[in-house]
Amino acid sequence: MAEYVTVFRAKVAEGDVKPLLAVEPKAIAEAKRLCPELLGADLVNIGDSTWLHVLRWSAADSVERLMARAEEFDLVHVMHGYLADAEEVGHGEVVNRS
């Protein structure tokens, strides 16, 4: 089965880290209910208030499928409120896993 990854980079203020970590699992569960192609997500703190949000998908067009249901988001919007200046770094197919 093919797997795809989308990576976003964002700034997270020090005071927003705990609320982000509390809401992110619930927001991802909400997103999975809306788009079962979302397999999971990882938050990575790379320092200097910069974080990566790595989303794993089962279909190449999963991001578009999820965004088509954006009006149904609740917790996803809350989570995005903690991710300042978020930008997509890239999206692609996983070609090797060791």
Name these PLM-found stretches.
Residues 8-12, 57-58, 93:
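Short, histidine-centered active-site or binding-site loop motifs used for metal coordination
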Residues 11-22:
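Short, surface-exposed ligand-recognition loops at beta-strand->loop->(often short) alpha-helix junctions
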Residues 26-39, 56-90:
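An amphipathic, aromatic/His-enriched active-site/gating alpha helix that lines ligand/cofactor pockets
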